[in-house]
Amino acid sequence: MPEPIIIEPEPAVAGSLFGDRIDVAREFTAQLGQRGEELGLIGPLEPPRLWSRHVINSVLVAPLLRPGLVGDIGTGAGLPGLVLAIARPDVDFVLIEPMERRVAWLEEQVAHLALGNVSVRRARAEEVAQEFNLDQVTARAVSAFAKLIPLTVPLVKTGGELVLMKGSNAEREVEAASKAIRKYHLEDVEVITLGSGQVDEVTRVVRARVA
């Protein structure tokens, strides 16, 4: 018999971050933890840290979103796109993902979790630049900020925002992207730290406005 998959216990902070959506978040996390490695969505080391490193890390971005249409680039397993859609039913999401098996997983979870605010588009970001006029765009662990700018800005309306999850090198990535920031007319570029005092691993976001 295969060894049972051990999923990290739900952190106490999860309930306050998801509010009345916590049951949906629990179901998604259970599904991803039990089936994610088999489907090639997460690695074998992830279930024991699934809540803290992935789900909580993603949901901390939810307060930065505003009602409208948000695109998530390279959604993969649904991080952060599905997690944010669970936490913010008042926001519409389009999850943009090129890999067929990941798209199948996302579509299955959208139906299973009854997420009426989510659509899934199988494509690369650069292939759908003319299709969308997003209010905001998110991405997590996709590429360096300088490379993400030309992929994401064409999807966003004037006055819209990039809300891109980054690691501890966020400030350096912003410095390295100075040419792209000017070329693509980004303003109010800032690094925001989320979760201080709530979680052990904070979430860093680069936020910028498309002028």
Curated annotation (Swiss-Prot):
Cite a single GO MF annotation. rRNA (guanine-N7-)-methyltransferase activity
Q: Supply the EC number(s).
A: 2.1.1.-
**Keywords for this entry?**
Cytoplasm, Methyltransferase, rRNA processing, S-adenosyl-L-methionine, Transferase
* Cited SUPFAM superfamilies: S-adenosyl-L-methionine-dependent methyltransferases
InterPro entries, alphabetically?
rRNA_ssu_MeTfrase_G, SAM-dependent_MTases_sf
Q: Where in the cell is it found?
A: Cytoplasm
Domain of life where this protein originates: Bacteria
Q: Does the keyword Cytoplasm apply?
A: yes
Please provide, in alphabetical order, the Gene Ontology terms of the cellular component aspect for this entry. cytosol
**Which residues of the sequence carry a binding annotation for S-adenosyl-L-methionine?**
G74, L79, A125, E126, R140
Predominantly, its location class is cytoplasm
- State the family it belongs to: Belongs to the methyltransferase superfamily. RNA methyltransferase RsmG family.
The job of this chain, per UniProt, is described as: Specifically methylates the N7 position of guanine in position 518 of 16S rRNA.
- Protein name (database record): Ribosomal RNA small subunit methyltransferase G
Question: What species does this protein belong to?
Answer: Clavibacter michiganensis subsp. michiganensis (strain NCPPB 382)
